[in-house]
Amino acid sequence: MGSPNLKMMLDTYHMNIEEDSLGEAIVRAGDQLGTFHIGENNRRPPGRGHIPWDEVVAALRAIDYDRDTVMEPIVHMGGGVGNLLAVWRDMTDDRDLDEAAREGLEFYRGKLAAAETGCAGPPASEAKEGHS
């Protein structure tokens, strides 16, 4: 890109569709990664799908990523975003959105902390079981 003011953004939802390896894509981005969007393969908050979070956080750690991370769950029908993205079912599991966001953030922070200490942390399936 050649400009110190121009960076790229990666999004785990889209990476899940397009990349062979999320970790390799993050490492290839390296210091050009300026913003990172986190969300599951099913657009739910982290810990409620099958994104390989241990691989993701290991790659972020490998490139010393310390910039903005944005959680981007899209779980409601209707409204501007729901209509634009054609969300056809409610994916909140009858849960409060603020609580779901907090749980997703706690899950992601736990994965980051585990990567720092060298422990894998709980698998995503455990996070899902606790919140069904």
At which residue positions do the language-model features occur?
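Histidine-acidic metal/acid-base catalytic patches
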Residues: M1-S132
